[in-house]
């Protein structure tokens, strides 16, 4: 029985050792890939930093406020457009009603003059 326990213990230790080797190898690969990407990104950042300048936070805030103002003005303009579209619809309807009333009045007058 003692011999079986020793063999089992040795087998478990061997499995643990192989598992640890695998984990260490994969960790080293992942660290190497990560380090390579960090270095690559650092070089790319240095390259584009020369091409593009970053805006100051105050300037970015000014742009944000300007954008908000323009959005508000657009909203107001859209409201005015909707108002004038409704007004146009009402004026078109009013014009149609006036035209109908004018025709009715014309017919009434012509009947009146024909009867006289």
From Swiss-Prot:
Pfam families: BLI1. Belongs to the BLI1 family. Residues 57-97 form a coiled coil. It comes from the Eukaryota. GO terms for cellular component: BLOC-1 complex; endosome. This is Biogenesis of lysosome-related organelles complex 1 subunit BLI1. Signal peptide: none annotated. GO terms for biological process: endosome organization; regulation of protein localization. The gene is BLI1. Component of the biogenesis of lysosome-related organelles complex-1 (BLOC-1). It is found in: Endosome. Keywords: Coiled coil, Endosome, Transport. The keyword Coiled coil applies. Component of the biogenesis of lysosome-related organelles complex-1 (BLOC-1) involved in endosomal cargo sorting.
């Amino acid at each position: 029985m003692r011999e079986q326990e020793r063999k089992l213990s040795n087998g478990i230790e061997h499995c643990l050792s192989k598992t640890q080797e695998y984990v260490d190898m994969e960790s080293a690969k992942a660290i190497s890939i990560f380090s390579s990407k960090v270095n690559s990104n650092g070089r790319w950042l240095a390259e584009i930093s020369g091409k593009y300048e970053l805006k100051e936070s105050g300037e970015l805030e000014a742009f944000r406020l300007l954008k908000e103002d323009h959005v508000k003005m657009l909203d107001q303009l859209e409201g005015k457009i909707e108002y004038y579209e409704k007004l146009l619809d009402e004026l078109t309807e009013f014009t149609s009603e006036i035209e109908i009333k004018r025709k009715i009045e014309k017919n009434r007058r012509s009947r009146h003059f024909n009867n006289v």
